[in-house]
Regions:
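Membrane-embedded segments
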Residues: 1-71
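A short, Lys/Arg-enriched amphipathic alpha-helix followed by its capping loop at the start of a domain
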Residues: 2-6, 150, 193
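Loop/turn elements at helix/coil->beta-strand transitions in domains of secreted/extracellular proteins
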Residues: 4-5, 31-34, 154-159, 198-200
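Second-shell loop/turn segments in exported
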Residues: 8-13, 130-137, 174-179
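N-terminal cationic-hydrophobic initiation segments that often serve targeting/anchoring roles
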Residues: 27, 151-152, 191-195
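Secreted/periplasmic serine-hydrolase-like ester/acetyl group-modifying domain
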Residues: 39, 52-160
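Active-site segments of SGNH/GDSL-like serine hydrolases
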Residues: 151-178
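Substrate-gating cap/lid alpha-helix
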Residues: 170-200
Length: 201
């Protein structure tokens, strides 16, 4: 679709700090021409230096000596190394596109979701989002520390940001919580900040 070679980097429920760590590694080791980045609004609600998952940083540095505890860990020796060795010489070209897929673990559709949900006809007062879309302080900090440094330091890299589609129930829950207008304003403000850069789509 976009040409070139891509690597899919996923962090389950990752914060923007988790994604920053992946970008740091990618840019420090490769010539990155294009970044496709799915922005989850919830990921921007974490403190900008807070990982949602602790990264074993010792595995990502250049010091081989501090990897000893990993390599000689009983679980790694007994389980993971044999699994890796069994795949030597094998090729599964589809695996790159299907890794981290978990959609088959769940049932989808209105018949699966709606029976457990009660809808209300009451009008919910929404939090005041202001007239002009403006990033909240938390969003600002995440964008300034975890997005913009890479966009600004790599003007030849094309950054393509997108919002993964949320279900209608997610938006209804935002309405029920009184944050629907605020969430939509945050999205709009984020779009305006990012699109100010020539290397962003």
């Amino acid at each position: 679709l976009f040409g070139g070679q891509f690597v899919k980097l996923c962090v389950n429920g990752g914060s923007s700090f988790d994604h920053k760590q992946m970008m740091e590694l990618a840019f420090s080791t490769h010539d990155v021409r294009r970044v496709l980045y799915g922005i989850d609004l919830d990921a921007l609600t974490y403190f900008y230096k807070t990982p949602n998952h602790e990264t074993p940083n010792y595995l990502y540095d250049d010091d081989l000596l501090n990897d000893v505890a990993y390599w000689f860990n009983a679980g790694v020796l007994a389980k993971y190394i044999p699994q890796c060795l069994m795949t030597l010489g094998q090729s599964d070209p589809d695996q790159v596109d299907t890794m981290y897929m978990w959609s088959d673990l769940f049932t989808y559709g209105k018949d699966a979701v709606l029976p457990g949900y009660t809808f209300s006809t009451r009008r919910v007062e929404q939090r005041d989002a202001g007239e002009k879309p403006t990033l909240s302080y938390q969003f600002q900090m995440n964008v300034q520390h975890n997005f913009l440094p890479y966009i600004e330091q790599h003007p030849d890299t094309q950054f393509m940001f997108f919002f993964p589609p949320y279900s209608l129930l997610s938006w209804y829950q935002a309405y029920e919580n009184g944050t629907l207008e605020l969430d939509l304003h945050q999205k709009q403000a984020l779009i305006e900040v990012l699109l100010a850069y020539d290397n962003v789509q």
